[in-house]
Amino acid sequence: NDLADINNDGWVDVITLDMLPKDEAVIKTSAAEDTYEVYNFKLKYGFHKQVSRNTLQLNQGALNSGEVLFGDIAGVSGLESTDWSWAPLMVDLDGDGWRDIFVTNGIVRRPNDMDYISFISSDSVQRLENVVPWIAQMPEGKVSNFAFRNKGDLTFEDKTVDWGFSLPSFSNGVAYSDLDNDGDPDLVVNRINETALIYRNNSDPGRFLKVIVYGDTAGGNRYAIGATVTATQGDQTQTHEIFPARGWC
């Protein structure tokens, strides 16, 4: 998951990922979440309602009671399905002042493929002494990562192809940093069984503000972890929190 302000209201929002496929064919050939019996069993023992899809929890601010209210808007935002996903990053990739969303994707094998489950569960396969060769027949899940442009109205546009992220891979961790000091964030993506990817951001950031934050060296927080930087212009407030890790590492 990742935490950042996606609508510039000063409140930190939350995105969490699951594994709802984007491709209709993959949806139809994948085993769904728990059966109704298992679903109710989990509810009985205190688990919350489980649905296999992404969520984007919009922070709606503090109530009169002091509690903070969140609401899931992933469905209306266009972010609820990104397949077998791992790390989301909420970061302004195109320099328009709104945080976009990048999602790493892919799994080496899809153990929930229903055709494969049916095949491997058959008596003829189960009677074999060595099933290792058949495990290799499990379908792979090499898919592209996703990039979504924040349109500024709580909806996102899929820019995966336009922004150059259409390469299928098994990607996990991702980090962003301005590697070439040109004002826009570049991406480093970790992949399974392959070299890492480095994506140079070629957008034109125009004017940008660079802030250096110093922490309390004596107190052991040299890099100011946990610090918050806010910039306000008109009715827009951009909030950035400093943490050494985001998404899924």
Language-model features, listed with the residues they occupy:
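Beta-propeller blade termini
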Residues: 1-8, 58-59, 86-95, 172-180
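Beta-rich catalytic cores
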Residues: 2, 52, 84-86, 143, ...
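Hydrophobic beta-strand segments that make up the repeating blades of beta-propeller
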Residues: 14-17, 101-105, 182, 186-191
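Residue-level signature of beta-propeller blades and closely related beta-rich strand-turn architectures
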Residues: 18-20, 62, 107, 193
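Short, conserved, GDST-rich strand-edge loop motifs in beta-rich repeat architectures
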Residues: 21-48, 107-139
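Beta-propeller blade repeat segments, especially FG-GAP/WD-type strand-to-loop junctions
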Residues: 27-37, 51-71, 114-118, 142-157, ...
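Short loop/turn motifs that recur once per blade in beta-propeller domains
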Residues: 36-48, 71-82, 131-132, 139, ...
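Gly/Ser/Thr/Pro-enriched helix-cap/hinge segments flanking short amphipathic alpha-helices
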Residues: 140-146, 150, 155-171, 175-249
